From Swiss-Prot:
Lineage: Eukaryota, Metazoa, Ecdysozoa, Nematoda, Chromadorea
Protein name: Putative pachytene checkpoint protein 2
Cited InterPro entries: AAA+_ATPase, ATPase_AAA_core, ATPase_AAA_CS, ClpA/B, P-loop_NTPase, Pch2-like, Pch2-like_N
Underlying gene: pch-2
Keywords per UniProt: ATP-binding, Meiosis, Nucleotide-binding
Biological function: Plays a key role in chromosome recombination during meiosis.
GO biological process: meiotic recombination checkpoint signaling; reciprocal meiotic recombination
UniProt binding sites for ATP: G179, P180, P181, G182, T183, G184, K185, T186
Length: 424
């Protein structure tokens, strides 16, 4: 049975252009470009890159302009085909043209009042950047997590643009992702910031991410940690003074700064740790007046976080361990990447027999899809991070420069078992 045709209201196109071309060159050809998107849409997947060969079909004048194209909407599942979309019309305001920054991060120093010492408190990234490229589309979750987070943050941004009265409608612009280590929380934050910097580049001429080293904010000097937290947020406030600059703040492992004060008191923790929590909460309240600041926090230990910090979060999402289907997709992506660079190769295997995209249990599967799905089931207990490390282990086990597809499957199964035994 065919799925009913869908009508989508909010489709976005992200176009990365070559450094040597100005944006105006591309903008003049939007209408021509939109027709090509419609023609290629049947094979396009939500938030997945479209092949330039497939898109431009030999038009070298267009092909040389573009490095990457992604189309997507929060109305479809991540990776879902656009083949059942009724009308793939993209509003010109939803076509986002961008270039990547290649300068790398800049270390930001903070120090004690006497100026005798300074420590690296954060890394400053210009967005969108090379280092965060492709993070978003390569994050695989079973739930609609990516769309939910993106939709919520977009709603926060729209409310901020309308200058909502925050005394009536509480908007803190604070996102908290929780879950066990290795599930992609930090990567999701970086991918989200990259994605939003592209989507909002018509409003903000510049976007930056300040990645805070929360461990460095604990001074060796008693009672200084609260002051260091304040100094860090002074830097954030200074960046946000430019209303044309979107500032993303990433606080990884926020439990280092935001541990529950009640439990700290009961365990006779140093009062400096409690001062740091107080300072963090005060600075979050202070920075909320800035419409162009979004704070992204991750935590491996949600139960240890101070309740006042969790309560300030606009949205709290748990990022769990991947399911069988998510692990399968990760393994398949790894194999296809190894095939792309010429490591996995098998001329005797027809294209139709390579592992397939599977969205549900009813999808018909070929032989290698079945084998890989069994490997994914065997890999229960491995995090996304652990799975992403398997290809190197697989390649190290091969005596040859290239690996046949059947042998690749055997090596992946061996690598999964080895990694599981290491975890146990």
């Amino acid at each position: 049975m065919h799925e009913p045709m869908k009508t989508l209201k909010n489709i976005h196109a992200e176009i990365r252009i070559c450094q040597k071309f100005p944006k105006s060159t591309v903008q003049k050809r939007f209408s021509e470009f939109e027709e090509l998107i419609k023609a290629a849409s049947k094979n396009a997947r939500n938030w997945k890159p479209i092949s330039s060969v497939e898109l431009f079909q030999g038009d070298s004048s267009l092909n040389e302009l573009f490095e990457k194209l992604v189309i997507g909407t929060c109305e479809l599942r991540d990776g879902e085909l656009f083949e059942n979309v009724n009308d793939l019309t993209i509003n010109p305001s939803n076509i986002h043209v961008y270039k990547l920054h290649k300068d790398g991060p800049l270390s930001q120093n903070i120090g004690d009042d006497d100026g005798d010492e300074s420590i690296i408190g954060s890394q400053l990234w210009q967005l969108p950047c090379v280092e965060f490229d492709s993070i978003w589309e390569n994050l695989i979750y079973d739930s609609n997590l990516k769309n939910e987070v993106m939709s919520y943050v977009a709603a926060l941004a729209r409310l901020s643009e309308k200058h909502v009265n925050t005394k009536i409608i509480n908007v803190n612009r604070l996102i908290l992702l929780t879950g066990p280590p290795g599930t992609g929380k930090t990567s999701l934050c970086k991918g989200l910031a990259q994605h939003l910097s592209i989507r909002m580049n018509d409003k903000y001429s510049k976007s930056v991410m300040l990645e805070i080293n929360s461990h460095s904010l604990f001074s060796k000097w008693f009672s200084e940690s609260g002051k260091l937290v304040q100094k860090m947020f002074d830097q954030i406030d200074e960046l946000a003074e430019d209303e044309k600059c979107m500032v993303f703040v990433l606080i990884d492992e926020v439990e280092s700064l935001g541990m529950c004060r009640e439990s700290s008191s009961s365990r006779s923790e140093p009062s400096d740790a409690i001062r740091a929590v107080n300072a963090l909460l005060t600075q979050i309240d202070r920075i909320r007046r800035r419409d162009n600041v979004l704070i992204l926090c991750t935590s491996n230990l949600e139960s240890t976080l101070d309740k006042a910090l969790v309560d300030r979060a606009d949205i709290v999402k748990n990022v769990g361990q991947p399911s069988d289907f998510a692990r399968y997709s990760m393994l398949k992506s790894s194999i296809m990447e190894l095939a792309r660079i010429g490591v996995v190769i098998d001329n005797e295997v027809h294209t139709d027999y390579w592992p397939q995209d599977i969205c549900d249990t009813k999808a018909p599967r070929n032989e290698f899809t079945e084998i890989l799905f069994k490997i994914a089931q065997e890999a229960r207990g491995l995090s996304g991070r652990a799975i992403s490390m398997l290809p190197t282990l697989v390649y190290s086990k091969s005596p040859e420069e290239t690996i046949t597809l059947p042998n690749c499957m055997n090596l992946f199964l061996e690598a999964v078992k080895e990694r599981l035994s290491r975890n146990n």
